[in-house]
Amino acid sequence: MRGTLPRRGRPGRSPAAARRRALSLLAALAGLLAALVVALPQTSAVAAIPGESNGGVRIMPLGDSITDGYTPYPGGYRVTLWQDLAGAGHLVDFVGSQTNGPAELGDHDHEGHPGWRIDQLDANIVGWLNATDPRTILLHIGTNDINQDDDVADAPARLSTLIDHILRTKPDVQLFVARIITEQGEPHATMVNTYNAAIPDIVASKGPNVHLVDMHAALTADDLADGVHPKQEGYDKMAAVWDSALESVPASLQPLPATPAPASAN
């Protein structure tokens, strides 16, 4: 009876060699997949969005979730405002470190930060301004100072400081400061009124490039979806107010005049 001989591996097929061969095949496969991904056309989720950074007048929408465009209408007032400005023939470039909104919004950039207070904007504003160099700023802020009960009595002073930092960094900017929209229920509705009452004097003290926008008068509690954030119709009302304010200050929709170069000495 013949004994069973032990099986022998094929020459050159040691375990170490097999591992090297497997790794080589995996590397080749990974390279092929990478090439295929690069060759595929971009999907709508990652493709460049027409109108972004289009060389127009740089406008920074600045604020909290109302600027971001909290549900039920992502993009908020920025959607209709962009459409209105573009429809009137203005070439504008919304700027900011944030980006979101629906396809009908031609430029998704902004500085709307959900849940943020005045002091949080103030802590970041210089970096944002230096990064984006806006010609015009639309500022709606203070709602979260009230909702978070963050030393509300001092909120106007914090707003004044924020404005000072904006003007110190960009002295030629056109800054539009809103009296913020109402809220449903007490005591917040009254707190909004108290905060808003201080804003006109603050704006008047900041010079000719700072403009008061009475957003509070444009919306009622019926325009709110959840007691704080507007419905789509409410955001459309906000867009109309911003649009009217911008149109009333032609410089806000025009590039900053170029500074003439100094004459060279002969």
Language model regions located:
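Secretory targeting and sorting signals
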Residues: 2-48
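Generic structural signal for well-ordered alpha-helices
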Residues: 125, 159-164, 196, 200
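Extracellular serine-dependent O-acyl
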Residues: 174-179, 191-225, 235-258
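Active-site segments of SGNH/GDSL-like serine hydrolases
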Residues: 140-144, 164-194, 216
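N-terminal module-boundary/linker segments of secreted carbohydrate-active enzymes
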Residues: 48-78, 247, 251, 257
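Solvent-exposed loop/turn segments at secondary-structure junctions
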Residues: 65-69, 76, 98-104, 142-148, ...
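Conserved SGNH/GDSL esterase-like catalytic core that processes O-acyl groups on lipids
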Residues: 58-60, 66-157, 190-194
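Loop/turn elements at helix/coil->beta-strand transitions in domains of secreted/extracellular proteins
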Residues: 55-59, 88-93, 132-138, 170-176, ...
